[in-house]
Amino acid sequence: MFHSVDVLSGRILYSKEAQAWPDFERQLAALRRAQQAFAARPVIERAALLHDLADKLAQARSRLAEMVCEEVGRCLRECEAELDKSVALIRYYARLAPQLLAHKTIATQASLSQVRFEPIGVVLAVMPWNYPVWQVLRFAVPALCAGNACLVKPAPSVARVTAALFELVGEHLPFQAAWLDHDDTLRAIEHTDAMAFTGSTATGRRLAAHAGQHLKKSVLELGGSNAFIVMPDADLAAAAKEACYSRFRDAGQSCNAAKRIIVAEAVADEFVPLFLAECAKLQMGNPMDAATTLAPLHREDLRARVHAQVQDALAHGARALCGGQLPRGSGW
């Protein structure tokens, strides 16, 4: 079952049943037929359809941004920025596709040598919840430009905005959602032509291993523990401001957030108060409120995990210089 939940109230906003495997097989067969017809069209025609999608996405900006805000929990202005970035991405690839995909003649010892770009077929993407519009389009748009069909298995907790996005896509692009449970997602890898995944390292290992067993191409973007490093000659005020932004932007729920802040010992005593002063400026609250700068976490279990990590660190000798307690009020 796919559920979208309001991060402030816990209220279920949208529910969708996972599709049965025979339904997916029929969907995949139809998508393969659509992909063949789509790939036969000139690149400029495929690009025109993507420009149309960009127009629709721009028109739906406010509505989709509010959905992302409610479901994911990020501040509304951050969700609006996600929509703007997504529109720009579509226009970028649609504009450059004829140039990027043009056949190229290259010099070799043969009488004629060319580089030609051919579609793979149907590509499956297993996508995360943190940027439910951007992550899907970042994967799909270049693949569509190249004449592929795209199937997206969304994260269960962003079902509503995913459904709204695919309503905009319509029937002119071979680009659909696959509402699969975990086991059927593994089976889908076997029946599609390539797989893309964004998410945790542990899940990426499992999916990549399954793709490898069936000789399917895979592209992975996996989680990390990025370090923000402050050197002795840094502008400490600027570094403190950027460190706070990098750690707490999108409530810290992004792959490129500063997971660790490493400060040269020579400047640590000076840096820490500057960083704490920046943290003190953060305003927790309703992510729809323009005054809010620190939005809720996405799910209750994620908040519980973060709190447990803080308590474990304190139990092992760490000191909490600010925060350290669960905030009162609604939301996570």
Please provide the spans of the model-predicted regions:
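ALDH superfamily catalytic-core signature
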Residues: 202-332
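Structural signal for hydrophobic packing residues in well-ordered secondary-structure cores
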Residues: 35, 39, 54-61, 65, ...
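A conserved hydrophobic position in a structured secondary element of the catalytic/binding core
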Residues: 5, 199, 263
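N-terminal Rossmann-like NAD(P)+-binding subdomain of aldehyde/semialdehyde dehydrogenases
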Residues: 1-111, 298
